[in-house]
Amino acid sequence: MSLIKVKIFILISFFFLNSNALSKKVLPAEILTADESFVVSLLKEKNTLKVSIKINERSYIYSEHLSLTDGKRTIFYDIIGESEVIRDDFYGESLIFKNLVIIVLENIDKFKGKTLLLSYQGCLENLICYPKISREIIVGEENKPNFFLKKL
Protein backbone atom coordinates (compact mmCIF):
# COMPACT_ATOMS: atom_id res chain seq x y z
CA MET A 1 0.00 0.00 0.00
CA SER A 2 1.29 3.43 -0.80
CA LEU A 3 1.99 5.94 1.92
CA ILE A 4 -0.81 8.22 0.71
CA LYS A 5 -3.38 5.40 0.94
CA VAL A 6 -2.22 4.59 4.48
CA LYS A 7 -2.55 8.25 5.51
CA ILE A 8 -6.03 8.47 4.00
CA PHE A 9 -7.06 5.24 5.74
CA ILE A 10 -5.76 6.53 9.08
CA LEU A 11 -7.53 9.88 8.65
CA ILE A 12 -10.83 8.25 7.75
CA SER A 13 -10.55 5.79 10.67
CA PHE A 14 -9.71 8.61 13.05
CA PHE A 15 -12.68 10.64 11.81
CA PHE A 16 -15.17 7.79 12.34
CA LEU A 17 -13.77 6.85 15.74
CA ASN A 18 -13.80 10.46 16.86
CA SER A 19 -17.31 11.17 15.58
CA ASN A 20 -18.64 8.09 17.38
CA ALA A 21 -16.97 9.12 20.65
CA LEU A 22 -18.20 12.70 20.32
CA SER A 23 -21.77 11.65 19.63
CA LYS A 24 -21.83 9.73 22.91
CA LYS A 25 -20.54 12.76 24.82
CA VAL A 26 -22.84 15.30 23.20
CA LEU A 27 -25.97 13.18 23.18
CA PRO A 28 -26.58 11.88 26.71
CA ALA A 29 -28.84 8.90 27.20
CA GLU A 30 -31.73 11.10 28.28
CA ILE A 31 -32.22 14.85 28.42
CA LEU A 32 -34.97 15.74 30.87
CA THR A 33 -37.35 18.66 30.65
CA ALA A 34 -37.51 21.03 33.61
CA ASP A 35 -40.88 19.50 34.57
CA GLU A 36 -39.26 16.05 34.64
CA SER A 37 -36.30 17.28 36.68
CA PHE A 38 -38.34 19.23 39.25
CA VAL A 39 -41.81 18.16 40.45
CA VAL A 40 -43.51 20.67 42.75
CA SER A 41 -46.34 19.80 45.14
CA LEU A 42 -48.15 21.52 48.02
CA LEU A 43 -49.24 20.19 51.40
CA LYS A 44 -51.10 22.13 54.10
CA GLU A 45 -50.76 20.99 57.71
CA LYS A 46 -52.71 23.15 60.18
CA ASN A 47 -51.40 26.71 59.62
CA THR A 48 -48.29 25.59 57.72
CA LEU A 49 -47.76 25.21 53.98
CA LYS A 50 -45.09 22.82 52.75
CA VAL A 51 -43.87 23.32 49.20
CA SER A 52 -42.03 20.18 48.12
CA ILE A 53 -39.75 20.05 45.10
CA LYS A 54 -38.85 16.48 44.19
CA ILE A 55 -35.55 16.69 42.31
CA ASN A 56 -34.58 14.01 39.80
CA GLU A 57 -31.47 12.07 40.86
CA ARG A 58 -29.51 13.58 37.95
CA SER A 59 -30.57 17.15 38.70
CA TYR A 60 -30.03 19.83 41.33
CA ILE A 61 -31.32 23.28 42.35
CA TYR A 62 -29.10 26.21 43.26
CA SER A 63 -29.70 27.45 46.80
CA GLU A 64 -29.08 31.07 45.81
CA HIS A 65 -31.67 30.80 43.01
CA LEU A 66 -34.48 29.50 45.22
CA SER A 67 -36.94 32.14 46.44
CA LEU A 68 -40.49 32.76 47.57
CA THR A 69 -42.06 36.22 47.33
CA ASP A 70 -45.46 37.84 47.57
CA GLY A 71 -44.73 39.73 44.36
CA LYS A 72 -42.96 42.58 46.14
CA ARG A 73 -41.15 41.23 49.18
CA THR A 74 -39.20 38.10 49.99
CA ILE A 75 -41.10 35.74 52.25
CA PHE A 76 -39.00 34.12 54.93
CA TYR A 77 -39.31 30.38 55.27
CA ASP A 78 -37.58 27.35 56.75
CA ILE A 79 -36.00 24.87 54.41
CA ILE A 80 -35.52 21.14 54.72
CA GLY A 81 -33.27 19.35 52.27
CA GLU A 82 -29.99 17.70 51.45
CA SER A 83 -27.46 20.31 50.36
CA GLU A 84 -23.86 20.26 49.27
CA VAL A 85 -21.29 22.54 47.71
CA ILE A 86 -20.34 21.70 44.13
CA ARG A 87 -18.35 23.27 41.34
CA ASP A 88 -20.09 23.23 37.97
CA ASP A 89 -19.59 24.74 34.52
CA PHE A 90 -22.47 27.19 34.89
CA TYR A 91 -22.05 29.02 38.22
CA GLY A 92 -18.76 27.71 39.58
CA GLU A 93 -18.79 26.89 43.28
CA SER A 94 -22.38 26.78 44.52
CA LEU A 95 -24.53 25.41 47.30
CA ILE A 96 -27.13 23.10 45.75
CA PHE A 97 -30.08 20.96 46.80
CA LYS A 98 -30.48 17.37 45.59
CA ASN A 99 -33.27 14.77 45.77
CA LEU A 100 -35.88 16.74 47.72
CA VAL A 101 -36.19 20.25 49.08
CA ILE A 102 -39.12 21.34 51.24
CA ILE A 103 -39.97 24.98 51.87
CA VAL A 104 -41.88 25.30 55.14
CA LEU A 105 -44.02 28.42 55.39
CA GLU A 106 -45.51 29.03 58.85
CA ASN A 107 -48.61 31.16 59.56
CA ILE A 108 -50.02 30.62 56.07
CA ASP A 109 -53.33 32.22 57.10
CA LYS A 110 -51.79 35.67 56.73
CA PHE A 111 -51.44 34.99 52.98
CA LYS A 112 -55.11 34.07 52.36
CA GLY A 113 -56.37 35.53 49.12
CA LYS A 114 -52.84 36.27 47.91
CA THR A 115 -50.63 34.87 45.20
CA LEU A 116 -47.09 33.84 46.13
CA LEU A 117 -44.30 33.42 43.61
CA LEU A 118 -41.94 30.45 43.88
CA SER A 119 -38.79 30.74 41.73
CA TYR A 120 -35.90 28.34 41.31
CA GLN A 121 -33.16 27.41 38.89
CA GLY A 122 -31.19 24.22 38.48
CA CYS A 123 -29.24 22.01 36.15
CA LEU A 124 -29.08 18.50 34.80
CA GLU A 125 -25.72 16.75 35.44
CA ASN A 126 -23.58 19.65 34.24
CA LEU A 127 -25.15 19.10 30.79
CA ILE A 128 -27.80 21.77 30.65
CA CYS A 129 -28.86 24.57 32.95
CA TYR A 130 -32.57 25.32 32.91
CA PRO A 131 -33.75 28.92 32.75
CA LYS A 132 -35.31 30.37 35.89
CA ILE A 133 -38.59 28.60 36.64
CA SER A 134 -41.48 30.40 38.35
CA ARG A 135 -44.71 29.01 39.78
CA GLU A 136 -47.60 30.89 41.31
CA ILE A 137 -49.02 29.55 44.55
CA ILE A 138 -52.55 30.86 44.88
CA VAL A 139 -53.70 30.83 48.50
CA GLY A 140 -57.46 30.42 48.89
CA GLU A 141 -59.74 32.97 50.54
CA GLU A 142 -61.03 32.73 54.10
CA ASN A 143 -63.99 30.55 53.12
CA LYS A 144 -62.02 28.64 50.43
CA PRO A 145 -58.83 27.40 52.08
CA ASN A 146 -57.47 25.71 48.96
CA PHE A 147 -54.06 26.13 47.40
CA PHE A 148 -53.34 26.08 43.70
CA LEU A 149 -50.07 25.77 41.87
CA LYS A 150 -49.87 27.53 38.52
CA LYS A 151 -47.10 27.50 35.92
CA LEU A 152 -45.99 30.82 34.52
Name the predicted role of every residue range.
Residues S2-L3, K7-I8, S19-L152:
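Extracellular/lumen-exposed scaffold segments
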Residues F14-L17:
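Hydrophobic core
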